[in-house]
């Protein structure tokens, strides 16, 4: 499930249609499938944050760093839940979503947009990722990428990152050094 994480919903739907029906998806099909997917995710109920991610975010924020969300998702419920679960951490003007890019991950565009909008030099920025496509995107943008294994992937799946951590706690200990 993490293999396509980070891609825009449209690109996943187009690829699936090519594989299943040997043709591109029409705009109405993309809209319908995406709406059905969003409704399904909404039915799953409450989502829970990755263990100890709040500690990482609070540490990064307390160090004075900007925190950006770079996601291939266009689901407004996801963005709203980020604000509900992590109040005062995320700012809407520091989010790059599927609505902001032409090319999703693994293309560098999402991370390049966040970097450009941050106004910071690249050496002052880093990416925290949990999926291979996001790692590739961050690296292609010329950024340092830290990967945290949050699911079923192997360390090898995340090996393109500059450093791989087995948990948010491990990442937090590294960041505090």
Feature annotation, model-predicted:
Residues 54, 58, 74-177:
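Asp-based, Mg2+/Mn2+-dependent phosphohydrolase catalytic module
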